Amino acid sequence: MSNRSFAIGDIHGCARTLRQLLKVLGLAKTDTLYLLGDYIDRGPDSRGVIETILRMQEEGFDIRPICGNHEEMLLLAIRSGVFELIEWLEQGGGATLKSYGVSQPQEIPRPHLDFMENLPLFRETDRFVFVHAGLDFTIEDPFSEAGRAAMLWERSGKVVPARIGGRKMVSGHCTQTLDEIRAGLKSSHLRIDNGCVYPGLPGKGNLVALHLETGALIVQENIG
C-alpha cells in the first residue's frame, strides 16, 4: 500500500467517534494524519481524544496536530484571569474538566497540557497549508505571530492562492454541511469541519476525514 495522507477536522471530545474513524481508515505507520485542532470541549471525552493522539504518536504513527482556538482558550484560562476562565467554560470547557475529573484546568495532567502548549499554529506541504481557521492575507506574512488570531479564529474563508504558493488551504473551525464540504473540494479552501459534536443539526454531526491524494471524504457519524 502506498503512503496516504489524511486530514481530520474538529473532534471536540468525541473520542469514540475518532477511534472508529481511525479504524475505518486503517491507518498505517507509513500514512500521515493531519489534525486541525479543537480536540477538546463540548463533547463527552476530551481526555480520551488527547490520550488517543498521544498514544498513537508514541506507537510510531505519523500524527501531525495543530492548535485550535479551544486549546488556546484553555491555555489562556490557566495563564490569565477569571474572565478567560469564564469565557472558556462558556464555550464547553466544563465538559473537558468533567472528562478529567478535575475542577480547574491547571489540574489537567501535565503531559496533556504540554501537548497543547507545543501545538504549532499551522503545517504545510508542497500542495496544502493546514490551519485551524484561516489566514490573514492583509498582513505581510500571514504565518507570523501577527497572524495568530486569524489562524485560530478567522471565519471569512478568504484565500489568496498566490500568497501561499498556489496551494490549497485545509481548515476546520467553521462547521459545514456535508454538501458544503463536497462542493468546497473544488475550491482553494477545503473546510472539513462537519460539526461532529452537533449530531442534531441537519447535514452535520459527523467526523470527516479528507484523503488528500484522492479528495475522497470518509464520513463517520457521531457515536460519542
Q: Model segments located where?
A:
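Active-site-proximal beta-strand elements of phosphoester/diester hydrolases
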Residues: 5-12, 128-134, 190-192
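Divalent metal-coordination and catalytic microenvironments
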Residues: 10, 38, 53, 68-69, ...
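His/acidic metal-ligating clusters that form di-metal
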Residues: 108-179
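Active-site neighborhood of divalent metal-dependent phosphoester bond hydrolases
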Residues: 42-124, 151-160
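Conserved beta-sheet core of the metallophosphoesterase superfamily
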Residues: 147-220
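N-terminal active-site segment of His-dependent metallophosphoesterases
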Residues: 1-52
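Active-site environment of divalent metal-dependent phosphoester hydrolases
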Residues: 12-16, 41-44, 72-75, 137-138, ...
